[in-house]
C-alpha cells in the first residue's frame, strides 16, 4: 500500500497523532524500474486492507496478485463473493495454501470454527475424507484454479502442524527456525507431488 499512499509522522513526535497521509510514488516508480532494469517477475502482495486506488495500482502495474486459500472460508462472508475462493482466482495471480506468516494448512483447519470447517467441506463437496488427509484435497483446489502459478509450502505438502510454522507476525522467539530434513523427502512424497502437478497441467519441465 505504501507505493500508493503512506502515513507520514513528523520526526520527534511521541505519538502518531500528528501524522497525515501522503501520496506515494504510484505507477511512475514501477515504470522507472522497468525502464532501468527491464521486465522483472514481481508479485504484488495485495493482502489485507485494499483501497480502490491500491487495486487500480496493482492493475496498472500488471503484476500478479496473491490469493491465499486460508483466507477464503470466513464464516462472516456469504455466497461465492470472496476473492480468495479458488474459482474466483484470475489467471494473473499466484495462489498459495498459506504463506510464511500463516498457520500450516493442517493447523489452520483445526483452529477455525466448526462453521468454517463446514464451509470447507461444502466447497470441496467432500464429507468423507478423514480430517488428517483433507489438506491434500485443499492443495488440489488451488491447482485446479485458473491462477498461472501455485506455491505450496513444504509444511503443507508434508501435512505438518504449527510446530513447523515459519513465522507468527508481531512475535519473537521461535520464528524462522523450521528446517526441512532430508529424511522428509521420501519417494512417496515425490510421487504425490508429481502426480498432482501432472494431473492439473502444472508440471514445469523447463
Predicted regions: what they are:
Residues 1-206:
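Catalytic cores of glycan-processing enzymes that make or break glycosidic bonds
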Amino acid at each position: 500500500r505504501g507505493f500508493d499512499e503512506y502515513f507520514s509522522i513528523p520526526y520527534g513526535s511521541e505519538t502518531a497523532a500528528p501524522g497525515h497521509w501522503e501520496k506515494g510514488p504510484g505507477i511512475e516508480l514501477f515504470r522507472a524500474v522497468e525502464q532501468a532494469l527491464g521486465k522483472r517477475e514481481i508479485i504484488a502482495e495485495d493482502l489485507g486492507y485494499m483501497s480502490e486506488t491500491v487495486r487500480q495500482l496493482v492493475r496498472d502495474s500488471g503484476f500478479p496478485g496473491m490469493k491465499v486459500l486460508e483466507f477464503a472460508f470466513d464464516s462472516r462472508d456469504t455466497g461465492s463473493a470472496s476473492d480468495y475462493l479458488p474459482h474466483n482466482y484470475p489467471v494473473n495471480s499466484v495462489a498459495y495454501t498459506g504463506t510464511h506468516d500463516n498457520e500450516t494448512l493442517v493447523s489452520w483447519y483445526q483452529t477455525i470454527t466448526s462453521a468454517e470447517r463446514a464451509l470447507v467441506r461444502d466447497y470441496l463437496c467432500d464429507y468423507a475424507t478423514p480430517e488428517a488427509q483433507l489438506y491434500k484435497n485443499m492443495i488440489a483446489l488451488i491447482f485446479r484454479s485458473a491462477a498461472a502459478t501455485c506455491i505450496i509450502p513444504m509444511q503443507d505438502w508434508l501435512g505438518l502442524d504449527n510446530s513447523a510454522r515459519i513465522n507468527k507476525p508481531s512475535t519473537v522467539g521461535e520464528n524462522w527456525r523450521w528446517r526441512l530434513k532430508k529424511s522428509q523427502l521420501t519417494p512417496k512424497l515425490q510421487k504425490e507431488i508429481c502426480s498432482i502437478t501432472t494431473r492439473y497441467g502444472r508440471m514445469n519441465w523447463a
